[in-house]
Amino acid sequence: MWMGLLGLLQGKPSFQAAALAVYSLASYLATAFAVNNFFDAESDALNPLKNNPFVKGCGKSAVHLVTANQAVAFLLVAACAPTPSLAAYAAAVLLAVAYSAPPFRLKGAAGLDLLSHIFYFGVLPFYFGAALVGAETSLTAFYTASILGAYSAFLQLRNLNADRRFDRIAGDRTLFVEHPQVSRALLYASGAFSVVGAALLTPLSAAVALPLSLFLGWKLGWERFVDSLVAVSLSLPAVAVLCGFY
């Protein structure tokens, strides 16, 4: 949802646009997680760190409820949003479903698991929000979308690394299962690109975020340094816009 709201704040959203964005993005995330949890239940049952509700007895009715809600959200977007925003939303939902669900199950195809995540979890939600408010194409928006794409890659690679043993057992040929060394290099590269990009795009915000990010990185590991610096650096200007400072 955060990526989509950053896109929304590329312009000046009305209350209607903001409400539509929040509801449709929340519905999209619910769909993505419900479908992923449903089709990952077998492998997640082997992983004690996973908290998959379908492993703990949640029935198919939850998927039906989420799907019905997604249909309502899609109809609202189709009725109220401009065509580019609708196209981005539809693409994000379809990719999120195709990532987990057969017969496509992009998660099980090395390379496509990463590429699809970059778009459906990073670039497309941002573009949906920006198009919803009719934000003009600009270098700042392009750079922001690029950073979000890299950060989405970082998040995906981190998850694939943590799940690689269980994905291998389940038969998912993820990038980390098939090419662990390349994946590890991409993990570091995407994290570095995200941090450097956020710092160059919003240097003042990055300077504000740096002390907290260094502390979190020292206490919790370098990945939390990346999370906090990217999130805070990109969010502070949006918060300033929201508060009417710009």
Where are the predicted features?
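Transmembrane helix interruption/hinge and helix-loop junction motifs
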Residues: 11-14, 78-88, 134-137, 198-207, ...
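Solvent-exposed interhelical
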Residues: 24-78, 149-195
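Membrane-embedded alpha-helical segments that form the functional core of polytopic membrane enzymes
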Residues: 2-39, 85-98, 137-158
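Small-residue-rich segments of transmembrane alpha-helices in multi-pass membrane proteins
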Residues: 2-7, 54, 114-130, 176-181, ...
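Hydrophobic, membrane-inserted alpha-helices
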Residues: 2-6, 68-76, 188-197, 211-215, ...
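A cytosolic-side transmembrane-helix exit/cap motif
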Residues: 37-44, 105-115, 134-139, 160-168, ...
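Extended hydrophobic alpha-helices typical of membrane-associated regions
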Residues: 103, 115, 199-246
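Intramembrane alpha-helical segments
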Residues: 54-136, 217-222
